[in-house]
């Protein structure tokens, strides 16, 4: 793709997200979502591969349907109460339609089927954009309208997402599909706490973006697409393999790494608000996600494939990759736990 066109598309995507985050009007929020969607579709299909074309078509159809439902929710509320302000959402059908529309855009269960298939048909960097940047605008709308959406719907969707994200990831050998189910599980934690403490959901989203970015950048750097490919990471670079291990364990929420803090705080808030059974179920489902992170960690750091090549330590060869951004992201994703109380005050 032409670099100028690529820059224009990325700028449009950023502008759409900022427009949605800063708007309180239904039409301007919808316009930002549409701008975001139309900018990412050429990026998904830029490889001209049949899988990329299929992924872009699926993404377009599901996002168009959810945007139409989002706009219908605003029209219904405006017809009933004569206002386009999102803060005055009082119509019950509009609340339900808004919940379903945002859940579809985020890829929450039970409307999650499109996310693994779309990620599998895209390059790793594009998959990273879909799982991180494309979640910001819908989550901003969800946090903006947290007190207007029925809490029962969000709690059920959150619990379903954590269960399906954990179970779905166990059966995957493709890393992009595994990260898709990881995204579904993490979004389940976010949407669950949104109805209780929106600021904690924002903190969780920030850490999720850091952890996912560092993990998927290592996958991109080492050209890993399947679990079998991760066996070569140690031969490529023992340091990278160790950091990949720590990033995965942090993504799974294992203490004392940074990924433990949002799960710990969310479980604490749920028990404080007398939702102990829900907190117990979510803690159990977190073990499912941790299982496939541990499996990937074991394969990438403790197994080396059989080879007849004399030179296995390719890390001795000089690499031309620039890893300065990756290094800073990994440091943030691993060692933010000690300053967690300062960040959530």
From Swiss-Prot:
One GO term describing the cellular component: mitochondrial inner membrane
Main location: mitochondrion
Official protein name in the record: NADH-ubiquinone oxidoreductase chain 2
Gene name in the database record: MT-ND2
Annotated transmembrane regions: 1-21, 25-45, 59-79, 96-116, 123-143, 148-168, 191-211, 240-260, 274-294, 324-344
Entry's family note: Belongs to the complex I subunit 2 family.
Biological processes per GO annotation: mitochondrial electron transport, NADH to ubiquinone
Catalytic function, reaction form: a ubiquinone + NADH + 5 H(+)(in) = a ubiquinol + NAD(+) + 4 H(+)(out)
Membrane topology, as annotated: Multi-pass membrane protein
Natural source organism: Varanus timorensis
């Amino acid at each position: 793709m032409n670099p100028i066109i690529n820059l224009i598309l990325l700028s449009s995507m950023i502008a759409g997200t900022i427009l949605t985050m800063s708007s309180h009007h239904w039409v301007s929020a919808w316009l930002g979502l549409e701008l975001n969607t139309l900018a990412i579709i050429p990026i998904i299909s830029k490889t001209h591969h049949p899988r990329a074309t299929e992924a872009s078509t699926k993404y377009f159809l599901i996002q168009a349907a959810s945007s139409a439902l989002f706009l219908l929710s605003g029209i219904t509320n405006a017809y009933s109460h004569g206002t386009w302000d999102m803060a005055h959402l009082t119509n019950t059908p509009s609340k339900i339609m808004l919940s379903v529309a945002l859940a579809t855009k985020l890829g929450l269960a039970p409307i999650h089927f499109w996310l693994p298939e779309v990620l599998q048909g895209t390059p790793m960097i594009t998959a990273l954009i879909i799982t991180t940047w494309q979640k910001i605008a819908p989550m901003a709308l969800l946090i903006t309208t947290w007190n207007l959406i029925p809490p029962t719907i969000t709690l059920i969707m959150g619990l379903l997402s954590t269960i399906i994200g954990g179970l779905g990831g166990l059966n995957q050998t493709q890393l992009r599909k595994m990260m898709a189910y990881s995204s579904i599980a993490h979004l389940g934690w976010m949407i669950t706490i949104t109805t209780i403490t929106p600021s904690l959901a924002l903190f969780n989203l920030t850490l999720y973006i850091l952890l996912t970015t560092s993990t998927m950048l290592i996958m991109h750097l080492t050209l890993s697409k399947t679990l079998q490919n991760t066996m070569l990471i140690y031969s490529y670079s023992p340091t990278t393999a160790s950091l990949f291990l720590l990033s995965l364990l942090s993504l799974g929420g294992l203490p004392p790494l940074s990924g433990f803090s949002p799960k710990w705080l969310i479980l604490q808030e749920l028990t404080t608000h007398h939702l102990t059974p829900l907190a117990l179920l979510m803690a159990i489902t977190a073990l499912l996600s941790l299982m496939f992170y541990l499996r990937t960690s074991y394969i990438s750091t403790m197994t080396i494939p059989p080879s007849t090549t004399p030179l296995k330590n390719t890390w001795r060869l000089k690499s031309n990759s620039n890893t300065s951004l990756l290094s800073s992201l990994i440091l943030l994703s691993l060692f933010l736990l000690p300053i967690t109380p300062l960040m959530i005050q």
